[in-house]
A protein has these predicted regions:
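Flexible, compositionally biased loop and terminal segments
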Residues: 1-240
C-alpha cells in the first residue's frame, strides 16, 4: 500500500541527485550503460509521480561538467541515450502537462543535441503543470563562474552599477533565474556529498539521503523523503 501524504506540506521544489546507476548494473552483472537506461525509466516515472503529487519544480542532475572525464565509450553511450531520451521525454511532458527546462552550458554538446534541447523547451513552454529541470553539462562552480562573467561585463559596460548588486542580482544571472530555490534535495545511493550541484541554490535546502540506488527509486521512496521533510523545522538561519 502506498504511503499516505494527507495533511503533509508538499515541497514546492525538489532537487534530485540520481546516484547509483553504475552500481545497480554491476550488482546484476550488466554493463554500466544498462544502469543509465534503467535510470532514465525511473526519471520518467518520477516526473509523473511528482506532477501527480503537486510538486511544482523537479530538478535532476543529468550530466555534470565532470562527467566528461569518464571513458570515451561511456560518454558516447550517455550522449546516445540523451538523444533517445529527449524524444521520449517530449511525449511524457505533453501527456502530463509538464514544462521542460535545461540548465547548464549546452555549448559543448553536438548541434543535434542542442537542437533537441531547444525543441523540448520550445514545445513545452506553454505547459502549466510541473516544471521539470534537467541539469546537463552542469556544475555549480561553472554556473557561478559563468554568471560572474556576465555580471562583470554588465558592470564594465555601465549597464549595472556594482554598488547596487545584491544576492537577488547574482541569482538573476544564474541558470535557475526565476525559479525558487529547492526546498528538498534527495540523493540516492547513500553518498553524503553535493557533487558540485546547485551550490548557490541549496543554502537553506533540507537534505534527504537514501541508500536506494537510483534505478530502484519509486513513489514510496519519494513519499518517504516528503514525510521526512515535514518533520524538519526550517529556520532559514533564524531562531524559532
Amino acid at each position: 500500500m502506498s504511503l499516505n501524504l494527507d495533511g503533509m506540506v508538499i515541497p514546492k521544489h525538489v532537487a534530485l541527485i540520481l546516484d547509483g546507476n553504475g552500481r545497480w548494473a554491476k550488482k546484476r552483472g550488466l554493463p554500466r550503460t544498462m544502469g543509465h537506461k534503467e535510470g532514465c525509466v525511473t526519471v520518467e516515472k518520477t516526473v509523473e509521480t511528482a506532477a501527480r503529487l503537486g510538486i511544482e519544480y523537479l530538478t535532476v542532475y543529468g550530466f555534470s561538467t565532470e562527467n566528461w572525464n569518464r571513458s570515451a565509450d561511456e560518454v558516447g553511450a550517455l550522449m546516445q541515450l540523451f538523444r533517445y531520451y529527449m524524444v521520449r521525454l517530449l511525449k511524457v511532458a505533453k501527456a502530463n502537462n509538464v514544462r521542460v527546462k535545461m540548465i547548464g552550458d549546452r555549448t559543448r554538446f553536438d548541434q543535434d543535441i542542442v537542437e533537441g534541447i531547444n525543441k523540448l523547451e520550445r514545445e513545452t513552454k506553454d505547459n502549466t503543470g510541473l516544471t521539470f529541470v534537467i541539469a546537463v553539462n552542469y556544475g555549480g562552480r561553472d554556473e557561478i563562474t559563468r554568471a560572474v562573467k556576465r555580471l562583470a561585463k554588465d558592470c564594465a559596460s555601465g549597464r549595472l552599477d556594482p554598488e547596487t548588486v545584491t544576492e537577488s542580482t547574482v541569482a538573476s544571472y544564474l541558470d535557475t533565474a526565476g525559479m525558487p530555490d529547492p526546498d528538498l534535495l534527495i540523493r540516492t545511493s547513500g553518498e553524503l556529498r553535493l557533487s558540485n550541484y546547485l551550490l548557490w541554490q541549496v543554502a537553506y535546502t533540507e537534505f534527504y539521503i537514501t541508500d536506494c540506488l537510483w534505478p530502484d527509486f519509486n513513489e514510496d521512496e519519494l513519499k518517504q523523503a516528503i514525510i521526512a521533510y515535514n518533520k524538519r523545522d526550517r529556520r532559514f538561519g533564524g531562531v524559532k
